[in-house]
């Protein structure tokens, strides 16, 4: 079976990670003790992708939980599904990273990373045929961003041919914990561009807007934001966890979604949007789902897809519905909005359907878009980064941990390069391909 090893790092990573396991355990009929109480063979058919089967028929998440302080881990352990995790897979330090990327990446995190790798190795060894890794983390803090990216690069060294997938929560001024978030995020993106195969950009600003505007929650809590994240994560992993044809493993998803290796930052979306604990009163129709799913208001990254063009799209529909209708609606969207899809990648929209809907919904749709509009998100961080870096504000926290200003400059220019690459493909048309190729080859050699 094609297994995935899940890792969660830092406070944010552990909170959304724990929520992810709650949601998918529920979908697969697994209770907090790891016992199966489901009612459908489909729930067990690919259970091995995320769970190990232990003695006595218990299912244990193939998850490694990492943090530089014990606090969040303790709350995961005492949370609703805290007892389902393997106790040895909790790896934590005592010092904390203090929202400092350098502490997570170079000092505190570097001391802990070997013991994390031991646990990861143990999980990987118990796999029959490991397909890859997924990490949940945030880019704004110290541990998830600094140590998370260190972990990725170490795993990349040891398992160079396995897929590396991240769910990365991008900071935003609206929901901000620390003033140095732009530094931490830029240093992290610098790593993600080089070392991951697929990164889902989940953006607190977009989540906040969805809670506020669509769900009419006046003061959204992290719990409300995480509810949206877990719905989205459950959606994008559906194809990996349930039997199906399309994007059934991480590599196939990457092949369909990533036209150029550096441009692997996806914008997830979800429909219908529901708030925590609410029930849906009527099932949506397939046209409504499709329309909502492509709506800018449903995107989990604060970028407007209408400001860019889609390179590739994957859609996952869940529930009992007519495949024919789904295909018709998806074609309909593409035909009506053809200017928003690049014409030099034909058939760049792929659709999968899974019979099992998420809890509390009759049908749902999850959206994964590789859009050039994601550059807005990187521009936003880059502007904040530059504003502080120009004045060398807060730099001593980083240089004090042994970092060099040079590294900041490199990260800044790598992020700006990423923005211009997206822009280049946004402007590209099928006709001008000739002159385009020569440039490309020149670039490749330079890189």
Swiss-Prot record:
Q: Which SMART domains match?
A: Tubulin, Tubulin_C
UniProt GO BP: microtubule-based process
Question: Which GO terms fall under molecular function for this chain's record?
Answer: GTP binding; GTPase activity; metal ion binding; structural constituent of cytoskeleton
Q: How does it assemble?
A: Dimer of alpha and beta chains. A typical microtubule is a hollow water-filled tube with an outer diameter of 25 nm and an inner diameter of 15 nM. Alpha-beta heterodimers associate head-to-tail to form protofilaments running lengthwise along the microtubule wall with the beta-tubulin subunit facing the microtubule plus end conferring a structural polarity. Microtubules usually have 13 protofilaments but different protofilament numbers can be found in some organisms and specialized cells.
- The reply on keyword ATP-binding is no
Q: Member of which family?
A: Belongs to the tubulin family.
Give any Pfam family that matches: Tubulin
Enumerate the residues binding GTP. 11, 69, 138, 142-144, 204, 226
Q: Ranges of Acidic residues compositional bias?
A: 429-447
Q: Which cofactor does it need?
A: Mg(2+)
The record lists Mg(2+) as bound by 69
Protein localization: Cytoplasm, Cytoskeleton
Highest taxon of the lineage: Eukaryota
Source species: Paracentrotus lividus
The record, for InterPro entries, names: Beta-tubulin_BS, Beta_tubulin, Tub_FtsZ_C, Tubulin, Tubulin/FtsZ-like_C, Tubulin/FtsZ_2-layer-sand-dom, Tubulin/FtsZ_GTPase_sf, Tubulin_C
Name the principal localization, coarsely classed: cytoplasm
Keywords in alphabetical order? Cytoplasm, Cytoskeleton, GTP-binding, Magnesium, Metal-binding, Microtubule, Nucleotide-binding
Q: Does the keyword Cytoplasm apply?
A: yes
GO terms under cellular component: cytoplasm; microtubule
The record's annotation in Gene3D superfamilies points to: Helix hairpin bin, Tubulin/FtsZ, C-terminal domain, Tubulin/FtsZ, GTPase domain
Its recorded name reads Tubulin beta chain
Function per UniProt: Tubulin is the major constituent of microtubules, a cylinder consisting of laterally associated linear protofilaments composed of alpha- and beta-tubulin heterodimers. Microtubules grow by the addition of GTP-tubulin dimers to the microtubule end, where a stabilizing cap forms. Below the cap, tubulin dimers are in GDP-bound state, owing to GTPase activity of alpha-tubulin.
- According to the UniProt record, where is the region Disordered? 420-447
């Amino acid at each position: 079976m094609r297994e995935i090893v899940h890792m969660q790092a830092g406070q944010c990573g552990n909170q959304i990670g724990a929520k992810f396991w709650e949601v998918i355990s529920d979908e697969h009929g697994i209770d907090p003790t790891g016992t199966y109480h489901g009612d459908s063979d489909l729930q067990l058919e690919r259970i091995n992708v995320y769970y190990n089967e232990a003695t006595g028929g218990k299912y244990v998440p193939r998850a490694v939980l990492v943090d530089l302080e014990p606090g969040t881990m303790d709350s995961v352990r005492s949370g609703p599904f805290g007892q389902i995790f393997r106790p040895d897979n909790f790896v934590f330090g005592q010092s904390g990273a203090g929202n400092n990327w350098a502490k997570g990446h170079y000092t505190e995190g570097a001391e802990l990373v070997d013991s994390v790798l031991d646990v990861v190795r143990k999980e990987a060894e118990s796999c029959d045929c490991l397909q890859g890794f997924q990490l949940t983390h945030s880019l704004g803090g110290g541990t998830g961003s600094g140590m998370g990216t260190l972990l990725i690069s170490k795993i990349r060294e040891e398992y160079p041919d396995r897929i590396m997938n991240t769910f990365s929560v991008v900071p935003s001024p609206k929901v901000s914990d620390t003033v140095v978030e732009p530094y931490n995020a830029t240093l992290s993106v610098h790593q993600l561009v080089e070392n991951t195969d697929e990164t889902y950009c989940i953006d607190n600003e977009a989540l906040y807007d969805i809670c506020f505007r669509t769900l009419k929650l006046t003061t959204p809590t992290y719990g409300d934001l995480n509810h949206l994240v877990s719905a989205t994560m459950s959606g994008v992993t559906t194809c990996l966890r349930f039997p199906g044809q399309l994007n059934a493993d991480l590599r196939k998803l990457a092949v369909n979604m990533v036209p150029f290796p550096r441009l692997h930052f996806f914008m997830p979306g979800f429909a219908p949007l529901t708030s925590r604990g609410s029930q849906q009163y009527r099932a949506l129709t397939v046209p409504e789902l499709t329309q909502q799913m492509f709506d800018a208001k449903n995107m989990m990254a604060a970028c407007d897809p209408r400001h860019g063009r889609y390179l590739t799209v994957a859609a996952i529909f869940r529930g009992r519905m007519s495949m024919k209708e789904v295909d018709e609606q998806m074609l309909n969207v593409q035909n009506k909005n053809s200017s928003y899809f690049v014409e030099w990648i034909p058939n760049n929209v792929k659709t999968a359907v899974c019979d099992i809907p998420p809890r509390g919904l009759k049908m749902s749709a999850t959206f994964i878009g590789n859009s050039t509009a994601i550059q807005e998100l990187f521009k936003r961080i880059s502007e904040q980064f530059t504003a502080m870096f120009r004045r060398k504000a807060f730099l001593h926290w980083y240089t004090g941990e042994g970092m060099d200003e040079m590294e900041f400059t490199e990260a800044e220019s790598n992020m700006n390069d990423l923005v211009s690459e997206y822009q280049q493909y946004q402007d590209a048309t099928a006709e001008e391909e000739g002159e385009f190729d020569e440039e490309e080859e020149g670039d490749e050699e330079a890189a």
